[in-house]
Amino acid sequence: MPILANLSFAPTQPTGWLSYSLNLLKELKNLDIDVLSPIEISGIKCHHSPPDMTTDFGMKGHFKRLLWTQFQLPNLYRQMKSTLLFCPIPEAPLFSSCSYVVTVHDLIPLRFPQWFSITQRLYCSYYIRAVIQQSKHVICDSMATAGDLSNFLGVPEEKITAIPLAYDVENFFYLDLPTQNYFLYLGRHNPHKNPERLITAFAGLSNCKDYELWLAGPSDRRYTPVLKAQVEKLGITHQVKFLDYIPYSELPKIINQAIALVFPSLWEGFGLPVLEAMACGTPVITSNLSSLPEVAGDAAILINPYNTAEITEAMQAIATQNQLRSRLSSQGITHSQQFSWEKTGKATVEVLSRYI
């Protein structure tokens, strides 16, 4: 009797959710598994879900997908004679007898409600809570998220398994390229990602004009104009580059040539850019909060993300100390090798196998 994996959210462009799902499916190949997906997945038997309800279609697609999940997915589950539904994001049918295991990547709207709409907060507080309550088990990416599940939603510890993510070893590795004088940030411009303090910290470098700050991530009409106005006010327009979305194939080169990745997020469910940068041998400066110390270990400079002076000090150290850069590069490569999709897959199989 097969497991049914629901990838009905899968967009055409790579995202963290999609990367998690696709890499995990490769490791679940020994299970009897069917996949619902709007896109073709190499080497995986897929049953097509409607293409107009993926994350490419924003809120409209999300609303369609939620209705489809409640009223159509249970029928497919029965038709395929599935014994377990695996949901790589926290979306599942509430009004059916489907047995399911769900992955929750973070609960950031509950941790920072001031930066999210009432709709997003209610979605987490009620829909995701209900999905979790009806699930057989909850997988999450880190002990930090496991703590949030218990603290915010009251999920019993015995119902949660934290399984670390991994990175794409075929795409992220050390390239023998000359380092260029830019600090790199990878991520969205949302306030909880902390780009505003990063820009302030960069402006505080004593030799700021010798360096650039590259912000690689999709523009957001709510936040990007504010950041650009801040850059102009600080007089560093020529040194801060807004790169918008970077094609996946181009990321390794950009990461490899950065003097450091600076990732001062206030909260992350995992923080995959930290691991990807380490695999490339690029020094990392990141937050001492949430899951980021779990991911970075002793192979990065950990800073208080609320303290801009501390971020500046770390960037200054990277810019001026060759031995520090060399040590962090070497330690990062070694540390990143502790993470693999094989390990993630094996731990996930152990959880799913309990409920087949």
Locations of the language-model features?
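Carbohydrate transferase catalytic cores enriched for Leloir-type hexosyltransferases
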Residues: 1-356
